[in-house]
Amino acid sequence: MIINHNMSAINANRVLGBTNADITKDL
């Protein structure tokens, strides 16, 4: 359960990172 939770957090961070990269690229 803890491992799955950590993996979800990592995936969420990747999505946020990709979104930030897209915003920065547009700027």
From Swiss-Prot:
Superkingdom to which the source organism belongs: Bacteria
Localization terms from the record: Periplasmic flagellum; Periplasm
Record keyword ATP-binding present: no
Primary localization class, coarse: periplasm
Keywords attached to this entry: Bacterial flagellum, Periplasm
GO cellular component, one term: periplasmic flagellum
Entry keyword annotation includes NAD: no
Entry similarity comment: Belongs to the bacterial flagellin family.
Oligomer and partners: The flagellum consists of an outer layer composed of repeating units of FlaA around a core that contains one or all of five antigenically related polypeptides.
Job of this protein: Component of the core of the flagella.
Name of the protein described by the UniProt record: Flagellar filament 31.5 kDa core protein
Taxonomic classification: Bacteria, Pseudomonadati, Spirochaetota, Spirochaetia, Spirochaetales
